[in-house]
């Protein structure tokens, strides 16, 4: 695989979900064949997001947490502080990748990232995401427009998991969630996990260099 020139990594800090969604949609609509690929890192305030395949009955009792209907694939999930969210904004035609290839690459990136912290995890062929002993630790939801990807992944690092009890995560009743904090004697910081995930992602897709900057 020929090395690609650049992956532009942008850390958005903590940002409302809808603001990130509007920005990634605008970026995807405006990019040209020469636009460098980007990977956005972000942490969202509490929010439930409902994918295009989402069904209302999977929102059990959202309560005071807002619900946003999105254009990504998949069903309902939760985002909140202490969760690593990453949005790969990639030109899949330039990468010569299909959507399934990207899903596999993201899952492998998460598995490799967790392995660096001694956590053994695996993807499921019939249920996108990454799991540890049948507990879900990372969720995926993508959209492709004009051959370019947006939306992405969410990895549970050190967060309050209780809002997941208000939904059927990803449309699965009773699906148990887990996080890195519950699987390690000492939890790394979100920034440390972000840096590890960026390295694994760049290696997996063959980017030669990464630039990292705060927005």
Swiss-Prot record:
EC number: 2.3.1.181
Chief location of this protein within or outside the cell: cytoplasm
Keywords: Acyltransferase, Cytoplasm, Transferase
Active-site feature positions: 170 (acyl-thioester intermediate)
Leading EC class: transferase
Pathway terms, separated by semicolons: Protein modification; protein lipoylation via endogenous pathway; protein N(6)-(lipoyl)lysine from octanoyl-[acyl-carrier-protein]: step 1/2
Protein name: Octanoyltransferase
Species this chain originates from: Cellvibrio japonicus (strain Ueda107) (Pseudomonas fluorescens subsp. cellulosa)
Gene expressing this chain: lipB
């Amino acid at each position: 695989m020929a090395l690609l020139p650049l992956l532009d990594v942008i850390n958005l800090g903590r940002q409302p979900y809808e603001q990130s969604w509007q920005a990634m949609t605008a970026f995807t609509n405006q990019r040209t064949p020469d636009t460098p690929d980007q990977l956005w890192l972000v942490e969202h305030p509490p929010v439930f997001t409902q994918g295009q395949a989402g069904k209302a009955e999977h929102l059990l009792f959202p309560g005071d947490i807002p619900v946003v209907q999105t254009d990504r694939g998949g069903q309902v999930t939760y985002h909140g502080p202490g969760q690593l969210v990453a949005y790969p904004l990639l030109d899949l035609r330039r990468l010569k990748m299909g959507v399934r290839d990207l899903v596999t690459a993201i899952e492998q990136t998460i598995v490799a990232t967790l392995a660096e912290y001694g956590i053994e995890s695996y993807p499921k062929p019939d249920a996108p995401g990454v799991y540890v002993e049948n507990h879900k630790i990372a969720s995926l939801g993508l959209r492709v427009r004009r051959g370019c990807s947006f939306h992405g992944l969410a990895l549970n690092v050190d967060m309050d998991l209780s809002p997941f009890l208000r939904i059927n995560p990803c449309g699965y009743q009773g699906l148990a969630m887990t996080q890195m904090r519950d699987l390690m004697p000492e939890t790394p910081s979100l920034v440390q996990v972000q840096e590890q995930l960026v390295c694994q992602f760049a290696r997996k897709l063959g980017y030669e260099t990464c630039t990292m900057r705060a927005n």
